[in-house]
Every structure is written in structure tokens, then in C-alpha cells.
Amino acid sequence: MIKGIQITQAANDNLLNSFWLLDSEKNEVRCLCAKGEFAEDQVVAVSELGQIEYRELPVNVAPTVKVEGGQHLNVNVLRRETLEDAVNNPDKYPQLTIRVSGYAVRFNSLTPEQQRDVITRTFTESL
């Protein structure tokens, strides 16, 4: 659980009246504001603060969402037939632009293999 603290007594004078977030599960503190040797947002073990006394402060801490992997969606509003015709007749579609990995790209600038890959990934029978 994370709680806010203000250090009220410490052997290190730079810690007096400093503000921290205390993570009691990890036994760590994150500096919010302190004089001297500790930087804002620095995380240290509670033991590095030495002998301290503190008072708790009300703090609202929003849970952080850690996304690893995840999903990515490119929306191309086209018919399959249009893309297949662009593969066979590139001169008819010089301005045809699609989304690939978040970027806008001219369909005709892709290799034939990439064009097929786009068509296969864009048009599926089911999700």
C-alpha cells in the first residue's frame, strides 16, 4: 500500500519537512520534495533515510497500468476488391493511401509481398 508521508524528525536535517510516497510492500520511498541530496522522483530504500519519524498525509494515487505487448489497430476503410485491383493495376491508384503500423503509406510504394500481407491482415473471415 502506498501512503504519503512528511518527515517530522530525522538525523539528517535535509530530510526535515520533506514529502515522500511510502510503499510499505516494497519498503521503498519516492521523493516528492526534499532539500539537499535527494532528487525529486528518486526512489530509495526506506533504510537509506536513516532514523526518521513522520506523519501520514492523505494521498490519492491512481494505479498505474503496465502494458506489455497489447493490441494495435489500423483502420483502412476500403474494399478488398479495391486493394486487389490496385495490385493488378497500380496506375489506376497512384494516390491510394493506407495505414501501416500507425503511418500513412502509399499502397503502390509497398512491395508485392507487403501488399499481399496488408490484404491478408485487413480482410479476415473472423476475429
From Swiss-Prot:
Gene Ontology CC annotation, any one: cytosol
Location of the Glycine radical domain: 5-127
Keywords (A to Z) from UniProt: Organic radical
PROSITE patterns registered for this protein in UniProt: GLY_RADICAL_1, GLY_RADICAL_2
InterPro entries: Auton_GlycylRad_Cofactor, Form_AcTrfase_GR_CS, Gly_radical, Glycyl_radical_cofactor_GrcA
Molecular-function annotations in GO: formate C-acetyltransferase activity
HAMAP family: GrcA
Function: Acts as a radical domain for damaged PFL and possibly other radical proteins.
UniProt-listed NCBIfam families: spare_glycyl
Protein name: Autonomous glycyl radical cofactor
Organism: Haemophilus influenzae (strain PittEE)
Organismal lineage: Bacteria, Pseudomonadati, Pseudomonadota, Gammaproteobacteria, Pasteurellales
Protein encoded by which gene: grcA
